[in-house]
A protein has these predicted regions:
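Extended intrinsically disordered or low-complexity regions, especially N/C-terminal cytosolic tails and loops
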Residues: 1-79, 110-125, 129, 145-189
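A contiguous pocket-lining binding segment that forms or flanks enzyme active sites
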Residues: 82-132
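Short conserved catalytic/interaction loops centered on acidic-Pro-aromatic/His motifs
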Residues: 135-149
C-alpha cells in the first residue's frame, strides 16, 4: 500500500466514523426544556454541539499527522538534503504556523507545484483557526482579536452563537473533502 492509499483509507475510516457520530448526535439530541434553570441563555443545540467540534479537531489532526510524513516522503524521494526539521529551525524560511511551514517546505524545498490546491489549503487554514478556538478557548471567541473573530464569522458553515463557535455538518464534510484533496495531491505529486 502506498502513501496515497494510506491517506485514502484514513479518510474513508473518518467518513464512516463521522457518519456514525452524526447519527448518534441526531438520535441523542433533544430540545432543552424551557423550564430548565438558566433557560434561554444556554444554547439549544443538544449533544451535536459537542460532536461537531470534536470532528473538526479530528479532521485537522488528520492533516497535522500526514503533512510531516509527506514532507519526509518527498525529502527521501527527491534525495533532498534539507529536512523539514532543519527547515523549521530557520525562522526566515518557516511559516507563521505549522501548516504554512509544511506548505513552504513542500513548495520551496521539494518544489511541488501546489497552486491548484490553494483553495483546499485556504479551507484547511480556516479549519486550523476554528480548531485552535476549540482547543485553546473552548470554542469561545471572547478573548480573540476582532480580526480573528471577523475571519471566523465569514467562514462558510461557521457561526457565532452567544460568542461560541458553532460549525455545521457541511463545514465538517467540506473540511474533510479539502483535507483529502490536499493530502492526495501532495502524495501523488
Amino acid at each position: 500500500m502506498n502513501i496515497a492509499d494510506h491517506i485514502a483509507f484514513d479518510v474513508e475510516c473518518m467518513r464512516d466514523y463521522f457518519t456514525r457520530l452524526l447519527a448518534f448526535a441526531k438520535a441523542s439530541s433533544r430540545t432543552p426544556s424551557p423550564k430548565r434553570v438558566g433557560g434561554p441563555q444556554f444554547l439549544p443545540f443538544g449533544i451535536a454541539c459537542f460532536v461537531r467540534p470534536h470532528m473538526a479537531c479530528n479532521v485537522y489532526s488528520l492533516v497535522d499527522f500526514w503533512l510531516p510524513r509527506l514532507c519526509f516522503y518527498h525529502q527521501q524521494r527527491g534525495h533532498l538534503s534539507l529536512s523539514l526539521e532543519d527547515f523549521k529551525q530557520d525562522k526566515s524560511k518557516r511559516g507563521r504556523n505549522d501548516l504554512q511551514t509544511y506548505s513552504k517546505y513542500l513548495s520551496k524545498v521539494a518544489r511541488l507545484d501546489l497552486l491548484a490546491e490553494q483553495p483546499s489549503f485556504r479551507r484547511i487554514d480556516d479549519l486550523r483557526e476554528v480548531r485552535n478556538v476549540f482547543m485553546h478557548a473552548g470554542g469561545h471567541v471572547l478573548l480573540l482579536s476582532d480580526q480573528k473573530r471577523e475571519r471566523i464569522e465569514r467562514m462558510p458553515g461557521v457561526s457565532l452563537e452567544m460568542k461560541l463557535v458553532v460549525v455545521t455538518d457541511q463545514f465538517i464534510w467540506q473540511s474533510l473533502d479539502h483535507a483529502s484533496q490536499y493530502l492526495q495531491a501532495i502524495a501523488r505529486a
